[in-house]
Amino acid sequence: MSNSIKVVCRFRPQNRIENEQGAQPVVKFEADDTCALDSNGAAGSFTFDRVFGMSSRQKDIFDFSIKPTVDDILNGYNGTVFAYGQTGAGKSYTMMGTNLDNDDGRGVIPRIVEQIFASILSSPGTIEYTVRVSYMEIYMERIRDLLQPQNDNLPIHEEKNRGVYVKGLLEVYVSSVQEVYEVLKRGGDARVVASTNMNAESSRSHSIFVITITQKNVETGSAKSGQLFLVDLAGSEKVGKTGASGQTLEEAKKINKSLSALGMVINNLTDGKSSHIPYRDSKLTRILQESLGGNSRTTLIINCSPSSYNAEETLSTLRFGMRAKAIKNKAKVNAELSPAELKALLRKAQSQVTTFETYVSTLEGEVQLWRKGESVPKEQWAPPLAGVSGAKAAAAQTPRPSTPSRLATESRAETPVAERSATPGIPIDKDEREEFLRRENELQDQITEKETQIAAAEKTLRDTKEELTYLKERDTKVNKDNEKLTSEANEFKMQLERLAFESKEAQITMDSLKEANAELTAELDELKQQLLNVKMSAKESTAALDEKEKRKAEKMAQMMAGFDLGGDVFSENEATIKKVIDHIDSLHEQSSAGEAIPPDEFEELKAKLVETQGIVRQAELSMFGSSSNDANVKRREELEQRLQVLEQEYEDLLERNLGEGDVAEIKERLEKAYSNNQDIKVELVEDLKKEVAQKSAEIEKFKAVNEDLQQRVKSGSASNGTAPGSASGKTVQQQIAEFDVMKKSLMRDLQNRCERVVELEISLDETREQYNNVLRSSNNRAQQKKMAFLERNLEQLTHVQRQLVEQNGSLKKEVAIAERKLIARNERIQSLESLLQDSQEKLTTASHRYGFPLYFRIDFNHTSIALLTFPLDSKPNCQQ
């Protein structure tokens, strides 16, 4: 039964991308089976079995295009439904839909499944059905089982009984619609999809869902089977629009290549001239070999875009559909006859054989007569075999039952040349063909195995390359880290050695500092002892000072007692003078009253004045007789000499106990103090001289006043009754008051001078005592000078000897330190030389290994050695 491929065209509405581009629909629907494309670069009218517009429903597509195909499958025919079109044209939507549970959104495949099980449920009970399904995809020209995704490179085989099939493909027996849906979901989840600029979920492979239905009549034993291929082709892609790159670009190349092979097969099937159909150029065309010009009833759904944005792709799709519509298939029922039918056919064949044998014998006799040259009358000719002609006609009109085979040779032998292109003209025997198919299957298995091995090897190679790249990067990083760590280790090693060397030097310096510390400790102990001695001396000096103050107090008391300046005596003298003054006043009043003054009164007044004069003279003698100027000068000189001796002794003591810097500082301070003391003493002596002169003048003045008073008394007594005026009395009283004030001032000065005199006497006594001690210790002044000279020489020699000893000790210490530093430096040089030698050996090894010189690091090592070494004559920075 010859039939053409049914071609159905479906247009989808414009999508978001086309609207954003400002495109407009360019398709017109002239009739239910005709559409016209009107665009600048593409135009034409196309006629198909049916054309569905942009508002068509899924149910409309199924009812017209697919429902008869389901009935054919149940009658034992093979069927194929596949969708073709550019990417994003709606192929997957047409085949699968959006939702299996939504009646409006379900696609062709779910509706076919529902129709199959509905037909099975409505069939007679004498027929048994078996339904099995399989799901595969062709991704990157490799057949992958979607129900077992680990099987990603299955081979294609061809056998006499089974035809073309995929070896190793999992077939699942199903008994309900839901089980088929589960298989569809399971396979759909494993299918490869990706996002492009044309489609958010673009199929990157051709998917093929196969439904095989086997039915058997339990009463007659007859059986027949049908196989339905539901193909969702990946869309053709234009890279400029999809923006494919990387892996997506490689997938697009493989998709376009397989679609080009499909187009070549269709072209060769429809041109009527090709002697070879290139089914084996692509695995897609190889699997669909029976669907394209073989034992199958095929429906092609072409999906198109109505937009001007994709006008060129739409034109190409419509032309593809027109070419496919010209393909003629010869479908036949895949049936197995029952034993009764086979017996009837056998009896019929045997009767035909008997008839044919009789007819052949008649024809052979007639032929022999003709060969002998005899003529056979026309009425004796063998008549045509009417039964044979009728049988041939009946056989031609009735489809002959056969085994379920889709072998290409049988279908092609029965297909007229006008309907499809011829197969290769080389005749092949049945045995040779079976051997050829067997050999082809073996080679196909080997090819598949080799492809699997190649794929595994390529994967291993990629993994190895990635691992090698990673290892190279890691090795480079490790080498850099190793070099860095090596340089750091060398640096740390050099720093460690430098620190060890510095530690040795520090130890040497520490030893020298310890020795210096010991010496300073000894000197400190000595100074402490000297300080203790000085404190003891200070205590003795304090005691001596207390004794001195005591003696001073005693001498002051003794001296003041000599002056008879006690309170009682002084009061009596004052009373005497006051009585004299009162007596003079009374005489003055008596004289003023005009009374006569007795001479006895004048004698008594004269005696009292003489007594007063004696008291004044006694005070003058006590003050000036005990301390003359010469004695004071002599005593001052002795005290100054004694002070110089004490200062010299003190300086000697400081020189023995202090260093040169301290001695110089103390000398400077003493010189300043001595000069200040000298200046103070000179000023004090000058002040004393001035005061003595002043007091002498005052005494002379008092003498003059006293003489004046005596003269007045005498003159008063001579006048005997002549009273002086009131002014004279007042003058005498004023003079007496002034005398009283002067007397008090003189007494204060006298007491101060007595204190100074006592101090000088005490100092003089101490100086005399020391002088006597010195005289007792030395026979004469010459011997004393000689001893002083010898002592100074001895001190100088001792000082020089001490300096020499100190210099010798310091030099010995410096020599020892220098020797230890020299030993440490030699060890350091030896270690650096060994390090340099090791570095040179390592650099030589690395140079031979990597093929490039590394001598610049030797310069670095030399530079490091030069930086780490320093002159041998450097002295330690320590205090000797």
UniProtKB/Swiss-Prot annotation:
> What residues does ATP bind to?
85-92, 235-242
The region called Disordered is annotated at: 388-426
Q: Provide the species name.
A: Botryotinia fuckeliana (Noble rot fungus)
This protein's record includes keyword Nucleotide-binding: yes
- Spell out the molecular function terms from Gene Ontology: ATP binding; microtubule binding; microtubule motor activity
Function of the molecule: Kinesin is a microtubule-associated force-producing protein that may play a role in organelle transport. Its motor activity is directed toward the microtubule's plus end.
Task: Give the record's GO CC terms.
Answer: cytoplasm; microtubule
Q: What is this protein called?
A: Kinesin heavy chain
**Description of its domains:** Composed of three structural domains: a large globular N-terminal domain which is responsible for the motor activity of kinesin (it hydrolyzes ATP and binds microtubule), a central alpha-helical coiled coil domain that mediates the heavy chain dimerization; and a small globular C-terminal domain which interacts with other proteins (such as the kinesin light chains), vesicles and membranous organelles.
According to its UniProt record, where is this protein located? Cytoplasm, Cytoskeleton
